[in-house]
Design a protein with these regions (language model features):
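Conserved motor-region signature of P-loop NTPase helicases/translocases
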Residues: 1-26, 81-87, 91, 98, ...
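Core structural elements
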Residues: 48-62, 123-147, 301-307, 322-335, ...
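P-loop NTPase Walker
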Residues: 1-72, 315, 319-325, 330-333, ...
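Active-site-adjacent bridging/hinge elements
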Residues: 62-68, 279-282, 301-309, 384-388, ...
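Conserved catalytic motifs of ABC-family nucleotide-binding domains
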Residues: 761-802
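Conserved ATP-driven helicase/translocase motor core recognized via long
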Residues: 6, 130-322, 422, 499, ...
Length: 959
């Protein structure tokens, strides 16, 4: 047996590590109760408190705390928060560019200075250098995903060095990729041509088209035989034009088959044209020249990034702070000896390797290259032993934006069965979902997940097999997964789709049976059993939340956006800006118009028009001193006195205490809490105070830097989402992103927004980055003012597009596998009927998987899911419904009528409501006597009342 403190167990999050530790402790305690005499179990219960069950960052932190002296690190370092690092990077970026400007403007015209000037001219020809700043930070952030960023940057620069003319160099990897990708497309095209020829030869087929299709086949086969990029380019150049389809008319030919061949021909021509435009858009000699000429940008930019990294490291050492990237790279520096001969474990790594009997890695598919090297260095017990146990599912690798490298997993997945000292264990069973859900997932992904897209063939080894046990039910519930395709017509797509989802929820809640493991019985579906998963919640969760709320469906969005746009947060931040610098017109007007100032629009207009001063602040001061309206002058005096009081306090008061006093003295905190959604607003203001406390723990001080701190968070979209005063445990429908749902499970899952276009912003930037291929950019002719992407940039863009599509495929897989009992896919697309016809044409021949071209041309999840369902009709695995906006309206009417009749026929007994109503209707009116008293009494009546007999002397009068 092995003691638990001799294992290194690494997982993805602190929460997962804590849960794993607790589960192991619970299991040990249970076993110890069964065998109290077992000394080994008792020992593990003691050792588990020191067991290395941790995240990779926590392990790296421990390495740094123990071996700080090896790299000259001050042991008192702390981890900077994201806001502080944003400020620090901005300060260093400014210094770096100022140095570069001084060099570029210097009298000595060095090559570096000239290249920097060209960098500015090509990336930032306008009035500012924001594009250069963005490019520098983009390359810097990307380089941190490489084990040795300096080497990667140098390699990117070296790629643009011309080889000697006498030197024969092999084609670079990125050129070979262009050839490989072209061959994949050509293979698809050839299959399409062969199928078209089959249709031509069929009974009543368009035989007159066969010659043209055979000419196409010959052309494609010539291209396929070309070896290497230059031969392919030459083959494309001489391939000539297409033979026209025959115009011969024959009534015996079926119109449908004729149109099918025409559509196939159009697709064949498009595919060939697209690959030519992608990789062979000019002569190889010209493309080679433009490639080397574009290197000026990469050389200048990589030097800037290197200088930026040096200065940032100096600043961080001065302030004795590290960020999370430093944890990994400094730990790598301690654990790995890296030189021109290669890499090997350091003495420190060998010490750890001796300590750990086994390295266990959870969620291995999300590891990156740096983490792989770190864990590999402490594995093998220093003697090359195979003692790593890795668990993961590459189909769920969805963190490419964090530079996760699923290729690490795939390499082991593909080789471990053949290696002597390795073993691959396939875990086929799924213990979450019903067989109907799994059958639906398998039906779709066996057709769309391939080695070329997604990284793995979805074969019998990758498929899901049911392992969960559900008690038999009545069989009345329709448990097949559903696909609801909506044509919104002239309605807003998001709102229409949200209504569709809401209607389906209303139909299911209270009637659809779900298995409750705690009750060991079926019960009606509740709102808390339902989740709506979206690819992105920004702009979608708000719409779904509003629509569902209007339909009476409680929902919890947990949105990650909206905090800095909340009116109460904007108001307080504007006040802080005014305290820092009162001559800012917009923040000053915002605060004065808010409840803090209490000035009306008319008052602000009067202040602006009463003075010729240009700044609004000066207008206010002038009116305060000499204005006509005494009331307005008094209000201004009160406002500015209070503002000056807070300005003086800001000089020596911690920001969080200043915020508390502002909210208290101005009354704005109480005001916000009294508004509708007051709990939410109060929570938002409390969060702002918490952010101030976090800021005060940084190396920055003062109100000015706090405002910069917040502005940096806003600029780089580090939005924390509105603070939530509620909890996810309430009986509400949850709306969340697919990424947030990873690792979770829900009885009923709606995967919505499938018609949303994939985000391709990354592919349209000035730079294209790749860990293996380097940096691609545009060739710019500054004389002719022409811009053209280099071949390397085109290759990286295509590579990134394929990697993005593979990521989207895996994200869809994660979403669909969250469902336990019912899976419902929804999407809205205009002209749905026409789209269906277009998707149907992709399936005119039965294929085991969709073609490479079909998969890579997808612009939304619908472009994968619907062709896959239409391919084999999917009737046994999915219920497919196409609805129009009118259908939606009609179903809504029917649902409302059905709900009304259900209430009338089967009224629900509510004991508490019954008791309340009985009490209200049975109680007498407590002020019955006062009803006889008049609200108004005339003088005559009063005179009469003075003459009342003695028995009425005690009667009170209420004026």
């Amino acid at each position: 047996p092995v003691d638990i403190d001799r294992l290194l167990i690494v997982t993805f999050t602190n929460a997962a590590a804590g849960e794993m530790r607790q589960r192991i402790r619970d299991a040990l305690e249970a076993r110890a109760e069964e065998a109290p005499e077992n000394a080994h179990l008792q020992r593990q219960l003691v050792l588990i408190h020191n067991a290395q069950i941790t995240t990779i960052h926590s392990f790296c932190l421990q390495v740094l705390r123990s071996h700080f002296h090896m790299i000259g690190l001050d042991p008192g370092f702390r981890i900077a928060d994201e806001g502080e690092m944003l400020l620090l990077r901005q300060d260093v970026l400014k210094e770096t560019l100022e140095e570069a400007y001084e060099l570029g403007a210097g009298e000595v015209n060095t090559a570096e200075a000239e290249e920097f000037r060209q960098l500015l001219e090509q990336l930032a020809p306008g009035k500012d250098d924001q594009a250069v700043q963005n490019a520098l930070l983009q390359v810097y952030q990307f380089s941190l995903g490489q084990p040795w960023p300096d080497e990667w940057l140098a390699g990117c620069r070296m790629a643009y060095c011309r080889p000697d003319k006498e030197e024969t160099t092999p084609e670079p990897d990125w050129v070979r990729f262009a050839v490989k990708d072209t061959k994949r497309v050509l293979a698809d095209v050839r299959e399409e041509i062969l199928y078209a020829i089959t249709l031509c030869q069929a009974e009543r087929g368009p035989y007159m088209y066969e010659k043209a299709m055979r000419d196409d086949l010959a052309m494609v086969e010539v291209l396929q035989e070309a070896d290497g990029y230059r031969e392919l380019a030459k083959a494309f150049a001489v391939s000539g034009t297409y033979t026209r389809l025959s115009t011969k008319k024959d009534e015996s030919v079926l119109k449908e088959q004729k149109e099918q061949v025409q559509e196939l021909r159009a697709g064949i021509k498009d595919a060939r044209a697209s690959v030519r435009v992608q990789y062979f858009y000019d002569r190889p000699e010209v493309l080679e020249e433009t490639f080397y000429a574009s290197g000026v940008v990469v050389r200048a930019l990589t030097r800037l990034v290197e200088r930026f990294m040096e200065k940032l490291t100096e600043k961080k050492r001065e302030k004795n702070v590290l960020d999370f990237s430093d944890l990994e790279h400094l730990a790598l520096e301690i654990l790995v000896v890296h030189d021109e001969t290669g890499t090997q474990a350091s003495p420190a790594a060998l010490e750890y390797a001796e300590q750990f009997e086994e390295i266990m890695i959870d969620e291995y598919q999300d590891s990156n290259l740096v983490q792989e090297l770190i864990l590999n260095s402490v594995a093998g017990r220093g003697r090359g032993e195979a003692n790593r146990f890795m668990v993961g599912d590459v189909k769920q690798s969805i963190y490419r934006f964090r530079l996760a490298c699923p290729e690490l997993f795939l390499e082991k997945y593909q080789t471990y069965r053949e290696r002597e000292n390795a073993c691959r264990i396939d875990l086929h069973k799924n213990f979450r979902s019903r067989s109907e859900v799994l059958d639906g997932v398998n039906e779709i992904f066996r057709q769309i997940m391939t080695e070329n897209l997604g990284g793995i063939v979805y074969d019998k080894d990758a498929m899901l097999y049911p392992g969960a046990v559900f008690a038999p039910d009545s069989g009345e519930a329709r448990r097949l997964p559903e696909f609801l395709l909506l044509d919104p017509e002239d309605q807003d797509k998001q709102e229409a789709e949200a209504r569709l989802v809401g209607m389906r929820i209303q139909q299911m809640v209270g009637s659809f049976p779900v298995w409750d493991a705690k009750l060991s019985a079926y019960r009606p579906l509740a709102y808390r059993d339902i989740v709506i998963l979206l690819r992105t919640v920004s702009g979608w969760a708000e719409t779904f939340g509003e629509v569902l709320g209007d339909m009476g469906i409680p929902c919890f969005t947990g949105s990650q956006k909206g905090y800095f746009s909340a009116v109460e947060v904007r108001t307080v931040l504007a006040y802080l800006e005014v305290l820092d610098n009162p001559v800012q017109d917009i923040p000053l007007a915002a605060v004065m118009r808010s409840p803090i100032g209490g000035f009306s629009d008319e008052a602000l207009a009067k202040l602006r028009s009463a003075s010729e001063e240009q700044r609004f602040y000066d207008c206010c001061i002038a009116y305060r001193d000499n204005g006509e309206d005494a009331g307005l002058r008094l209000a201004l005096d009160t406002f500015f006195r209070q503002m000056e009081y807070f300005r003086e306090k800001a000089a020596y008061t911690p920001i969080h205490l200043l915020l508390w006093e502002i909210l208290d003295v101005t009354g704005y905190g109480a005001y916000a809490a009294a508004l509708p959604a007051g709990r939410q607003r109060k929570a938002n203001l409390d969060m702002l105070v918490e952010k101030a406390i976090a800021y005060e723990a940084t190396s920055y001080r003062g109100l000015y830097h706090f405002i910069r701190y917040i502005e940096s968070l806003k600029r780089y979209e580090v939005d924390y989402g509105e603070a939530s005063p509620g909890t996810e445990s309430d009986d509400t429908v949850r709306i969340m992103s697919i990424h947030k749902s990873k690792g979770l499970e829900f009885p009923v899952v709606f995967v919505s927004g499938l018609g949303k276009q994939f985000n391709e912003t990354e592919l349209r930037g000035r730079l294209a980055l790749h860990s293996s291929f380097g940096i691609g950019c545009d060739y710019v002719d500054t004389t002719l003012r022409l811009r053209q992407p280099s071949l390397l940039k085109k290759v990286i863009q295509k590579t990134s597009a394929l990697e993005n599509l593979g990521e989207e495929l895996r994200i869809l897989y994660v979403a669909m596998t969250r469902a336990k009992e019912k899976l419902i896919l929804t999407g809205a697309v205009p002209n749905a009927s026409q789209k269906l016809e277009a998707w149907q044409t992709l399936n005119i021949r039965a294929m085991e998987t969709l073609s490479y071209s079909t998969l890579t041309k997808a612009s939304s999840y619908l472009d994968w899911v619907l062709p896959a369902l239409l391919q084999h009709s999917g009737e046994d695995c999915f219920l497919l419904r196409v609805l129009s906006a009118e259908d939606l309206l009609e179903e809504s009417r029917e649902a409302k009528a059905s709900d009304l009749w259900r209430v009338l026929e089967h009224p629900k007994e509510e004991p508490e409501a019954r008791r309340y109503l009985e009490r209200v209707f049975s109680e007498g009116y407590p002020y019955e006597q006062e009803q006889a008293i008049s609200g108004k009494v005339s003088v005559t009546e009063l005179k009469k009342q003075t003459e009342l007999p003695e028995e009425h002397e005690g009667l009170e009068l209420y004026p």
